[in-house]
Amino acid sequence: MLRESDGEMSLGTTNSPISSGTESCSSFSRLSFDAPPSTIPEEESFLSLKPHRSSDFAYAEIRRRKKQGLTFRDFRLMRRIGAGDIGTVYLCRLAGDEEESRSSYFAMKVVDKEALALKKKMHRAEMEKTILKMLDHPFLPTLYAEFEASHFSCIVMEYCSGGDLHSLRHRQPHRRFSLSSARFYAAEVLVALEYLHMLGIIYRDLKPENILVRSDGHIMLSDFDLSLCSDSIAAVESSSSSPENQQLRSPRRFTRLARLFQRVLRSKKVQTLEPTRLFVAEPVTARSGSFVGTHEYVAPEVASGGSHGNAVDWWAFGVFLYEMIYGKTPFVAPTNDVILRNIVKRQLSFPTDSPATMFELHARNLISGLLNKDPTKRLGSRRGAAEVKVHPFFKGLNFALIRTLTPPEIPSSVVKKPMKSATFSGRSSNKPAAFDYF
């Protein structure tokens, strides 16, 4: 069953068709070169140094070329590799890199601004670009470059050769991951969500199709056009049992540039001055009334038409873990309206075809906490990843060293040859750092 998503939802929503990997890019190339390419002003397009990309050859190449100002003509499109609700993604490489064995491959997302303006979705493309500029994390994309070409807006990011977790799951026995594999991928997604929430970003579109697999087997979340970027900052919660200390402090408003500094400063104060308090990287005051997401993954508060906040990501995380382990989502049904009704009214249940091991019982307990229909009681809604990480399902897993673990599967590094009319390729070969705190 195809999952309908990637947009502000209605029961008639459908995904844009994805063409075969060998589709020619020549028509787009012609359109782009009919008008002189415009570039983003230097102060806006300058790529600030990203510490997590310090050993990334592809990132270094982009930064070297960036000094002269990048345009569409600096890239060679190879083939179309995906399409979504707001854009089309092409595999590409830097023009002039004739030795393919030494070339870095990239993914270029191309947005037709005129088409989006007609559909009144241009704000989604702008939101994604804004968020990408904020990110510097091993499990999240880095914005390598951005530029305009005629009425197209282009962003260049890392190319993930391993596809996505949805496709990878379908290649597993019985189309589901082992518990240990599911735990590995869930842990990396959890760390990525923690970082996003620390920045005040509610993802709102977590699903296996949006979790890409890098060439080293580790994951990368993608597609941020449905995300909510709030001014809410992380809260401080007391570990004391007194009612007044268990209240979350109401965060003040800060500019986006000052937000991260305030979090770091506050976390240091928590550690040094108030040892009984816990730093919570969770935008607990962020709210939205938008009806967005993927039907099988939306939380009950969204399905019922109410407002929502950070808790929707923890619901989606529970649905994701359920699907990874059992091969289907917990409230799946033949039609979208029945799916939404199930999400609101039907009780969570688990397969009973075989006895559950203790490891699986831990997984079920975690999923049950995440899929609490009351967002105020949902696991993660108040203290975020901090309370999810300590669940017995993740016992023995060192989150700070997760990138040193060998992933369940490491994809082939082979990139298919482009067609004659194609252009571009790029892929990073960065080695992971020893550890990460976010």
UniProtKB/Swiss-Prot annotation:
Record carries keyword Lipid metabolism: no
Coiled-coil region(s): none
Result for mutant: residue 225 to G: Increases autophosphorylation activity
SMART domains: S_TKc
InterPro entries named among the record's database cross-references: Kinase-like_dom_sf, Prot_kinase_dom, Ser/Thr_kinase_AS
Annotated PROSITE patterns: PROTEIN_KINASE_DOM, PROTEIN_KINASE_ST
Catalytic residues identified in the record: 205 (proton acceptor)
Activity regulation description: Activated by magnesium and PDK1. Inhibited by staurosporine. Repressed by calcium.
Enzyme Commission number: 2.7.11.1
Tissue: Expressed in root hair cells, shoot xylem parenchyma cells and endodermis around the vasculature. Expressed in anther primordia, vasculature of the growing flower stalk, young pedicels and bracts and developing sepals, but not in petals. In pistils, transiently expressed in the vasculature of the style and the septum, and in the integuments and funiculus of the developing ovule.
SUPFAM superfamilies linked: Protein kinase-like (PK-like)
Effect of residue 378 to K: In pid-4 and pid-12; strong pid phenotype
Pfam families: Pkinase (PF00069)
Domain Protein kinase, residue spans: 75-394
Reaction(s) this enzyme catalyzes, per UniProt: L-seryl-[protein] + ATP = O-phospho-L-seryl-[protein] + ADP + H(+); L-threonyl-[protein] + ATP = O-phospho-L-threonyl-[protein] + ADP + H(+)
GO CC, any one term: cytosol
Record keywords: ATP-binding, Auxin signaling pathway, Cell membrane, Cytoplasm, Developmental protein, Kinase, Membrane, Nucleotide-binding, Serine/threonine-protein kinase, Transferase
Gene Ontology MF annotations: ATP binding; kinase activity; protein kinase activity; protein serine kinase activity; protein serine/threonine kinase activity
Occurrences of domain AGC-kinase C-terminal (ranges): 395-438
Posttranslational mods: Autophosphorylated. Phosphorylated by PDK1.
GO biological process, one term: root hair elongation
Further comment: Plants overexpressing PID are small with dark green, curled leaves, with vegetative and floral organs defects and reduced apical dominance and internode elongation. Specific overexpression of PID in root hair cells suppresses root hair development. Over-expression of PID induces a basal-to-apical shift in PIN2 and PIN4 localization, resulting in the loss of auxin gradients and strong defects in embryo and seedling roots.
Function: Serine/threonine-protein kinase involved in the regulation of auxin signaling. Acts as a positive regulator of cellular auxin efflux and regulates organ development by enhancing polar auxin transport. Phosphorylates conserved serine residues in the PIN auxin efflux carriers. Phosphorylation of PIN proteins is required and sufficient for apical-basal PIN polarity that enables directional intercellular auxin fluxes, which mediate differential growth, tissue patterning and organogenesis. Phosphorylates PIN proteins (e.g. PIN1 and PIN2), especially when NPY proteins (e.g.
Protein's name according to its UniProt entry: Protein kinase PINOID
Source organism of the structure: Arabidopsis thaliana
Species lineage: Eukaryota, Viridiplantae, Streptophyta, Embryophyta, Tracheophyta
